[in-house]
Amino acid sequence: MEEKNMKKATIRDVAKAAGVSQSTVSRVLNNNGYVGEDARRRVEEAMEALHYSPSAIAVCLSKSRSRMIGVIVPQIFAPFFSRMYYIADRIMERYGYRLLLCNSDESLKREKELIDDLLSYKIAALLIVPVDGDEGSNKAYLDQIRSTGTPVVCVDREIEGIHCDGVYIDNYTACYEVTKDVLARGYRNIAYMADPPIYRPGCDRLRGFRDACKEFGVTVPQENIFLAPIEDTKPLNAFLHDVARRDVPPKAIINFVRGWDY
């Protein structure tokens, strides 16, 4: 009867079964360097007989670059970042890459630790939504990583003065144009919902909204402005229910809470 907890075969076991050195097995695994046809056949047969599969981490460490891309987001539960990861994963899969997803939890210290962990796996590139708040940012460190040859792409949050590549949204113009369009249609009693202005995207949206209102001479009461914590939908739902029960509810609601569809 086969044991339930069979010992996993190692590269040493394969080498012994094939009658070759461990370095020969390594060359077969990495397809690097000369290996005779007979030796290669024996190694492959030994791997099959022993059900040997190399550790993904060991393979990464044996190469100068892995086929893995590190991804760091600040709030893994936020729908916007989940969708971003999903799309990136589908695209990178076409090119033979796998993604390693990490959550910085909006912590500058944790973000740097995660970057170091990912670099230890010799990632091919880093895709990051950087922390950039009151604590500052890891701008200098990200630039340093880029200068050593690891591609770094910042997404969503643009850090001023950073030299890494980036994919950003013009949040100011988007919110300004949407608000301007609503006001141009004659709406004056309006409400605004968006992420809190803690990070640059939220700040830019709020600025765009206020500039459009100012241009049309419209003052929106504070009770009609809700800056939603995206990790909890309860306050946002409460705001919407409150708005709906008013004697004179807003005629239009401008929603820039990323990821939440109402």
Question: Can you name each region flagged by the protein language model?
Answer:
Residues 1-4, 17, 49, 90-98, ...:
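Bacterial carbohydrate/catabolite-sensing allosteric modules
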Residues 1-67:
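N-terminal helix-turn-helix DNA-binding module of bacterial transcription factors
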Residues 54, 63-77, 95-97:
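Interdomain hinge and pocket-entrance segments immediately C-terminal to HTH DNA-binding domains
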Residues 73-90:
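N-terminal winged-helix
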Residues 104, 131, 156-159:
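Histidine-centered beta-alpha loop that forms part of the nucleotide-sugar donor binding/catalytic region
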Residues 109-116:
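Conserved ATP-dependent adenylate/AMP-binding module captured primarily in the ANL superfamily
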Residues 126:
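Intrinsically disordered, low-complexity polar regions and short flexible loop motifs
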